Amino acid sequence: MDRIIEKLDRGWWVVSHEQKLWLPGGELPHGEAVNFDLVGQHALHIGEWQGESVWMVRQDRRHDMGSLRQVLDQDPGLFQLAGRGIQLAEFYRSHKFCGYCGHPMHASKSEWAMLCSHCRERYYPQIAPCIIVAIRRDDSILLAQHTRHRNGVHTVLAGFVEVGETLEQAVAREVMEESGIKVKNLRYVTSQPWPFPQSLMTAFMADYADGDIVVDKKELLTADWYRYDNLPLLPPPGTVARRLIEDTVAMCRAEFE
């Protein structure tokens, strides 16, 4: 799976280090390896996009290292592969030694895993499941400003799934903890890999059941009901949060217009 890059190799290049991505000119590099000074480097084939290979290269470039969010507006399939590259680069960087016996580890040749030659333990990339939910009450949707997003963006509620918890239980707990309300009629919508960090977003829609909004000030700045045709600043297109909001708006339009 891992090999030395040759002069004629071409494709999409996910050059990553410490969860950063090399974006010369603000774009994901595409073309022949020689044009990006990649010949002789180690590369891992992580997929294909539009008939061309996608390669992950673990390397820190002095300039143009940015965030994966900068390519969020590209095609979802390419964004997903770039996210895979970042997560794999971070996985290999953080698993050089075995967590059980402390001996050095090496990469598997048959799968994305790290192996310990001493105790035979096998490690796989960490994936953190999260829930994200759009909550509707009549013609309105619950939107909140998160403390970590002080840019005026209002979005739906989300959170990590805890150990020993189902996705449904996670939705009920997160909604109650952050907003103080209860929900009903939970429906699964879609999922999205989201490497900020190593998350798998599982998206739901739900209906308001009971309770008054009581904001968890540790997590949220504000939370309120917004009529579907009078919404504040929203997350960018391409995010699963935006998808949930747009789906809720479409349902409201169909019912109230």
Curated annotation (Swiss-Prot):
Protein keywords: Hydrolase, Magnesium, Manganese, Metal-binding, NAD, Zinc
GO MF, any single term: manganese ion binding
Binding-site list for Zn(2+): 98, 101, 116, 119
UniProt enzyme class: hydrolase
Enzyme Commission number: 3.6.1.-, 3.6.1.22
Quaternary assembly: Homodimer.
PANTHER family, per the entry: NAD-CAPPED RNA HYDROLASE NUDT12, NUDIX HYDROLASE, NUDC SUBFAMILY
Described purpose of this protein according to its UniProt entry: mRNA decapping enzyme that specifically removes the nicotinamide adenine dinucleotide (NAD) cap from a subset of mRNAs by hydrolyzing the diphosphate linkage to produce nicotinamide mononucleotide (NMN) and 5' monophosphate mRNA. The NAD-cap is present at the 5'-end of some mRNAs and stabilizes RNA against 5'-processing. Has preference for mRNAs with a 5'-end purine. Catalyzes the hydrolysis of a broad range of dinucleotide pyrophosphates.
Protein name per Swiss-Prot or TrEMBL: NAD-capped RNA hydrolase NudC
